A protein has these predicted regions:
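GIY-YIG nuclease catalytic motif and its immediate N-terminal context
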Residues: 1-39, 43-55, 60-67, 80, ...
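A common structural junction motif
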Residues: 72-73
Length: 96
């Protein structure tokens, strides 16, 4: 799964604080978040659990999708997560 554009949502816990990001290497980026190697929001608020991701063919499409999701209200984001991950299980294990 290296070098494939992706949009992802991290959560601090079930129905907790959310963070939306975009990357070209999902495994590497989530590992960085989990190990607090990314300074800022996710480190400060303990947002480390991968609860949603979608892969894209082109980075531009992933960036546009990230921008779109960041504009959504919280409930729409929760609905998106729960559509594919109703129990908010940690998806990290699926990747590695």
């Amino acid at each position: 799964m290296e070098k494939q554009p992706a949009v992802y949502i991290l959560a601090s816990k079930y129905n907790g604080t959310l963070y939306i990001g975009v990357t070209s290497n999902l495994i590497q980026r989530i590992w960085q978040h989990k190990n607090d190697l990314v300074e800022g929001f996710t480190e400060k608020y303990g947002v480390h659990f991968l609860v949603y991701y979608e892969l894209h063919e082109q980075m531009l499409a992933a960036i546009e999708r990230e921008k779109q999701l960041k504009k959504w209200n919280r409930q729409w984001k929760i609905d998106l997560i729960e559509k594919v991950n109703p129990t908010w299980k940690e998806l990290w294990e699926e990747l590695v």
